[in-house]
From Swiss-Prot:
Keyword Membrane: yes
Family note: Belongs to the complex I 49 kDa subunit family.
Keywords attached to this entry: Cell membrane, Membrane, NAD, Quinone, Translocase, Transport
Domain of life of the native organism: Bacteria
Subcellular location: Cell membrane
Stated role: NDH-1 shuttles electrons from NADH, via FMN and iron-sulfur (Fe-S) centers, to quinones in the respiratory chain. The immediate electron acceptor for the enzyme in this species is believed to be a menaquinone. Couples the redox reaction to proton translocation (for every two electrons transferred, four hydrogen ions are translocated across the cytoplasmic membrane), and thus conserves the redox energy in a proton gradient.
Gene symbol of the encoding locus: nuoD1
Protein name as catalogued: NADH-quinone oxidoreductase subunit D 1
GO cellular component terms given for this protein: plasma membrane
Reactions that this protein is recorded to catalyse: a quinone + NADH + 5 H(+)(in) = a quinol + NAD(+) + 4 H(+)(out)
Length: 404
């Protein structure tokens, strides 16, 4: 090639521009910075950068007793605090060797709350994602109205709409309210219809279809390489779901399907979310029908659980147990465990180490959102800048657990 031809090609090559999106930008769904290299409107290179929301939750847990650490686990995936609570206490229960002694009422209640929280979390992602795709108004209002019904159940049951810290090692913090079943029944009556309406509005919107179909595609091999789990993996043809592959809390006894898509695009990530919510409603229905109302809500073990107040007033032994648990907590045998559950965003795992004391020696969390965020180069490169907003919305990360 002559020098003249080389210069001519150089003049024709579009100029590249570096653009920084975030960390304070509504489209990033949190404090995320994405450094983009653009040729015109096309993303040539994408580099996600996290760490702006670091809260030191794992380190904080090392300075709290085993039960106290439950309260900080809520703050990671703040849209799904029940998942954080449950995964952590299950790890501690495994260290103690009491996982088979957890009362059935506590196990079934955990399942109901986990699935309610899954639906609530998905509704946030769908509502805000609808805004990102230009579907202003209807999706977010419908989604948040239905989510508000779930938060009412949480508030009535746990005392908090968010960050309830309701799980305890051995069971639940306190018993269910007398009208718990009625509140969940009322929700189950309206939820299927509302979710179907939201699905019709979003998935059949021609603008959304044009912007999401075949956009931000990730293959099964790429998803595995980036460590994706949950919906972000299941849209690539995999049926991996912790509830099916490694059942916990009796999930093997519930009749539900794991939705699977194969296109791996943004449209599929939204469509599978609706399918998962319908399956969650089926699980809630079955769990509610089999809830042993008169069973204990927490393990009967004075070394681990506070004695009833009336007992403390009349029994010196109960008073001693109460004092010991409040001021010192309980000791956990030395050892290490890894326990994972299926959160709304995928497999959230807890690696917990005990040195035999009353506090964790180490708590390491495997957050599914972290892996989803760092798959953004695959989802963005080769697509338009405007597709970035939708791609981030459909992987649905929560940065409390990314940076923890």
């Amino acid at each position: 090639m002559s020098m003249a031809e080389d210069l001519h090609l150089e003049e024709q090559r579009p100029e590249r521009m570096t653009l920084s999106i975030g960390p304070h930008h509504p489209a990033t769904h949190g404090v995320l910075r994405v450094k983009l290299e653009l040729e015109g409107e096309t993303v040539v290179k994408a580099e996600p950068e996290t760490g702006f929301l670091h809260t030191g939750i794992e380190k904080t847990a090392e300075h709290l007793t085993w039960n106290q650490a439950t309260t900080v686990m809520d703050r990671m995936d703040y849209l799904s605090p029940i998942s954080n609570n449950t995964g952590y206490v299950m790890a501690v229960e495994k260290l103690l060797g009491i996982e088979d002694r957890i009362p059935e009422k506590a196990r079934v209640t955990r399942v109901i709350l986990l699935e309610l929280n899954r639906v609530a979390s998905h509704l946030v992602g769908l509502g805000t994602g609808g805004l990102d795709y230009g579907n202003i108004g209807t999706p977010i209002f419908w989604a948040f109205e239905l989510r508000d019904r779930i938060l009412d159940i949480f508030e009535h049951t746990t005392g908090q709409r968010m960050n309830p810290s309701y799980m305890r090692v051995g069971g639940l913090a306190y018993d269910l309210p007398h009208n718990f079943k009625e509140m969940v029944e009322d929700f189950l009556k309206v939820a299927p219809g509302r979710i179907q309406e939201l699905k019709d509005v979003m998935l059949h919107n021609p603008i959304f279809v044009d912007r999401a179909k075949g956009v931000s595609v990730i293959t099964y091999e790429q998803a595995l390489r980036y460590g994706l789990t949950g919906r972000n993996l299941r849209v690539t043809g995999s049926d991996y779901d912790v509830r099916k592959y490694y059942p916990y809390l009796g999930y093997e006894n519930y009749d539900f399907k794991v939705p699977v898509y194969t296109d791996g695009d943004s449209w599929s990530r939204v469509a599978i979310t609706f399918d998962e919510m319908f399956e969650s409603l089926k699980i809630i229905r079955q769990a509610l029908d089999n809830l042993p109302w008169d069973d204990r809500y927490i393990i009967d073990d004075r070394k681990l659980v506070l004695p009833p107040k009336q007992e403390v007033k009349h029994s010196m032994e109960a008073l001693i147990h109460h004092f010991k648990l409040v001021h010192h907590g309980f000791d956990v045998p030395a050892g290490e465990v890894y326990v994972s559950i299926e959160s709304p965003r995928g497999e959230i795992g807890f690696y917990v180490v005990s040195d035999g004391g009353n506090k964790p020696m180490r708590v390491r969390v495997r957050p599914p959102s972290f892996y989803a965020v760092y798959s953004l180069p695959v989802l963005l490169e080769g697509h338009l800048l405007s597709d970035m907003v939708g791609a981030i919305a459909t992987i649905d990360p929560v940065f409390g657990e990314v940076d923890r």
